[in-house]
Amino acid sequence: MKNWTDVIGTEKAQPYFQHTLQQVHLARASGKTIYPPQEDVFNAFKYTAFEDVKVVILGQDPYHGPNQAHGLAFSVKPEVAIPPSLLNIYKELTQDISGFQMPSNGYLVKWAEQGVLLLNTVLTVERGMAHSHANLGWERFTDKVIAVLNEHREKLVFLLWGSHAQKKGQMIDRTRHLVLTAPHPSPLSAHRGFFGCRHFSKTNSYLESHGIKPIDWQI
């Protein structure tokens, strides 16, 4: 069984990834504020071991406001206001999962610790500038992460919200994994079909049908 050290270690030896990390380092060194902090960039892999992954939720790039991003897609630190997309995720959960109570914070570590890989496809961003690090090579790295999960694991659930995530997920073998798609939970698109998608109960039904412990979504 592979682990993240194998996957990330192999990629870190590649020139493209060394270039990515160098570009981020140079941006920080030049005085730019880059999110998340250096020690949090790879948190998705720290909280969810390769062999423990049950569900993959793909985000795009980190939140670009102060004190928000901490390396898990959609998640924010406990003391920070819940961002609109995450609020809509919670709204769907209240409709989808019996007994789910609207959380008071957006800190999703509890999901990560249960096997929900909260993976942004770009792992850094400059303060106040969405998608500013979109062309640094992160996409190639996260494509590799998805490919390795697809190949070396089975019976995973991939939640792909919005066209960006769905494009990233085209390679996933749908005979071995469950792939659920919906519009992005952003206020701009949630009403086009994210609300009512019931992805959280569908995820748990699939896991349980394969003898895998379901996710407790309550935060």
UniProtKB/Swiss-Prot annotation:
UniProt entry tagged with the keyword Cytoplasm: yes
Main location: cytoplasm
Any single Pfam family the record assigns to this protein: UDG
EC number annotated for this UniProt entry: 3.2.2.27
Annotated active site: 61 (proton acceptor)
Disulfide bonds: none
Record-linked InterPro entries: UDG_fam1, Ura-DNA_Glyclase_AS, Uracil-DNA_glycosylase-like, Uracil-DNA_glycosylase-like_sf
GO biological process, one term: base-excision repair, AP site formation via deaminated base removal
UniProt-listed CDD domains: UDG-F1-like (cd10027)
Gene3D superfamilies for the chain: Uracil-DNA glycosylase-like domain
GO molecular function: uracil DNA N-glycosylase activity
Domain of life according to the entry: Bacteria
Keywords: Cytoplasm, DNA damage, DNA repair, Hydrolase
Annotated Gene Ontology cellular component terms: cytoplasm
UniProt-annotated location(s): Cytoplasm
Record field: catalytic activity: Hydrolyzes single-stranded DNA or mismatched double-stranded DNA and polynucleotides, releasing free uracil
UniProt family annotation: Belongs to the uracil-DNA glycosylase (UDG) superfamily. UNG family.
PANTHER family associated with the record: URACIL-DNA GLYCOSYLASE (PTHR11264:SF0)
Record's function text: Excises uracil residues from the DNA which can arise as a result of misincorporation of dUMP residues by DNA polymerase or due to deamination of cytosine.
Protein name: Uracil-DNA glycosylase
Phylogenetic placement of the source organism: Bacteria, Pseudomonadati, Pseudomonadota, Gammaproteobacteria, Pasteurellales
